[in-house]
Amino acid sequence: MFQRRSLLSVRSSGSQIAFRRFVSLTHKDPTPDTTSCNIIKKEGANIISVYARYPVVAAKGEGSYLFDKEGRKYIDFTSGVAVTSLGHAHPEVARLAADQCSKLVHSSNLFYNEPAIELSNVINNSLAKNSGIAGPTKIFFANCGTEANETALKFARKAAFEKYGEGKSQIVYFNNSFHGRSLGSLSITANPKYKRGFQPLLPDVVQAVYNDPASIEQFVNDKTAAVIVEPVQGEGGICPAKPEFLIALRKACDKVGASLIYDEIQCGLGRSGDLWAHSIVKDVASPDIITVAKPLANGLPIGATIVSSKIAAEIHPGEHGSTFGGNPVACRVGTFCVNELGSSKILQNVRKQHKALTSRFDDFVAKYPNLIRGYAGRGLLLGLQFTEPPAKFIELARQQGLLLLPGGNNNTRVLPSLNVKDEVIAKGLDIMESTLKALSK
């Protein structure tokens, strides 16, 4: 099948000739005499190996491109795993970060912090227009998505405790979900391979079935404090939630007095084609809590947990905190990023490039049915669905100068920056097609 045939096509001498007709491996993996290889060796001697890294040493970025230590240019359809949504080395991001660094980098949360206050105001005003959350929202700033989700779990349980007392602490999550790697967020991440060796995890969590409205009442009951769901699943395999599923979740949460948490860490802030991924159901399935992170400051570490006024009223000084949460540099940049990502210019480009990508994906499905079985996603959070694990496809695309990401369920994730230009999309698609041609021979 796919992997076996593709490996044979590379190794056999006859197939090598046919293979080279379609692809030119201009970005081969570094050889022992290169600067990149020496850096990779040093990393292995000094850093704990928890990442399956590509053999690429990123030296700099510019827009939708990454450059390695040998000066080779790559089209970046990973965006730092949906982080650099405004592209690499955005001039205004760089200017604002440098200016804030020259004034104040950190003062602790003992003092008021104007950049954090300004960012919270921008986010809250945006949600007032684009989300159905009742009443004004309030925000807790953290450093990443995992911390934002941990905060969401704590706040949801605290709100349930204050209203209902002990015994209402259950958290419901879904198959193929990914919410983080700390003990709490790992407990509500579905993939068992991430959990092996780290048990026991958080008690009183229940896994339910994603996109199955009929099954919700089996899992959401009087003991449920919160339901956490991704409006578009990312790492577990690109899968948008059906509107009727989110509506059913809202109704189930209302029935038992549970909080509905939308994890928009990967799908939010414009990547779905809307600034807030849940806004397509804002009038009928608004959340009580939203978590965001990845693109919030275009690469600077930041996360945010946004809650309704009812939940905020149950959280008091000393009940949560973060040393670096609300960092002035990240928040100063974040204010610009939220405004820019919510602009009509960016959102129109997301929808335009979505059409360009999916039009070619339709061709791929028709031309290469032995390799591609379909695609899914919203906006520029797309998954090309392979018939078998796509590791060889991703490797060969990289060796032609295109960076892609694996995803669950045999997906290849396609995550360009949201301001990506037409010619970059076209070139990336051409590399994908040449790789598919080669692997299909």
From Swiss-Prot:
Gene3D superfamilies: Aspartate Aminotransferase, domain 1, Type I PLP-dependent aspartate aminotransferase-like (Major domain). It catalyses: N(2)-acetyl-L-ornithine + 2-oxoglutarate = N-acetyl-L-glutamate 5-semialdehyde + L-glutamate. GO terms for molecular function: identical protein binding; N2-acetyl-L-ornithine:2-oxoglutarate 5-aminotransferase activity; pyridoxal phosphate binding. It comes from the Eukaryota. GO terms for biological process: arginine biosynthetic process via ornithine; L-arginine biosynthetic process. The keyword Ribonucleoprotein does not apply. Its main location: mitochondrion. It is found in: Mitochondrion matrix. It is an enzyme of class 2 (transferase). This is Probable acetylornithine aminotransferase, mitochondrial. It comes from Schizosaccharomyces pombe (strain 972 / ATCC 24843). The lineage of its organism: Eukaryota, Fungi, Dikarya, Ascomycota, Taphrinomycotina.
